[in-house]
Structure formats: C-alpha cells, structure tokens
Amino acid sequence: MARVTVEDCVEKVPNRFALVLLSAHRARGISAGASLLVDRDNDKNPVVALREIADDVVDHEGLREQLITTLQRVDEHTEAEEEAETLALLADPTHMQMSELELVRALQSDRDGGQEERY
C-alpha cells in the first residue's frame, strides 16, 4: 500500500496543528491497546493513525473530545479543599471583627509571600 502523506490527511482535518495533535493522540491510543481500524501493513503506530485519519474511518470529533479530556487537568480534590476553606472563613466571625489596618497587613503579608514583618 502507498504511504500516507500529510496532504491526504489535510483534506480530512484542514488544520495541520490539529492533525498532529489528533494523530499523536490516536497513535498513543493504539500503543495503549486500542483496536486498529485499518490493516497495520507493517507500519508504525503514527503511520497507522494517519492512515486511519486519511481513510476517514476514525471519528474526528470523538477523537478531538478525547484529546481535550486528556489534556484538561482538573484537580477536584484541591477545588473542594479551597471551597471548604472559604466556607470555613465565612462561618468564622473573628475575621469580621478585624480592623482595617489588620486587614491591610494580612493582605500585604499574603502578597509578600507570607512574611509577617518587613525589613
């Protein structure tokens, strides 16, 4: 079989950068054990991924959504901790009795990296 070229794939995915991302993601999926949608023909995983894109046997939008999901980094544990800390601060009445000067010092301390005193 003839080698696949980028020009064959650009007809299916017009943006070359998106093509690189999609084909690399598909090649990683193949390396991880995903089933092949075309015959391997002794080709390496990136070439197989490009052939799948060129032959239009892979769902481009589905592959794009999978790629976006894997690139997103959401640390839900940290978000939950921050929300709990905010709720605890709102429930604590002592910060409501803080003077304006104390508030400014606390904010400057946070800004300066936690230093309590300036030298």
UniProtKB/Swiss-Prot annotation:
It comes from the Bacteria. Belongs to the RNA polymerase subunit omega family. Keywords: DNA-directed RNA polymerase, Nucleotidyltransferase, Transcription, Transferase. HAMAP family: RNApol_bact_RpoZ. This is DNA-directed RNA polymerase subunit omega. The RNAP catalytic core consists of 2 alpha, 1 beta, 1 beta' and 1 omega subunit. When a sigma factor is associated with the core the holoenzyme is formed, which can initiate transcription. Its EC number is 2.7.7.6. Pfam families: RNA_pol_Rpb6. One of its GO terms (cellular component) is DNA-directed RNA polymerase complex.
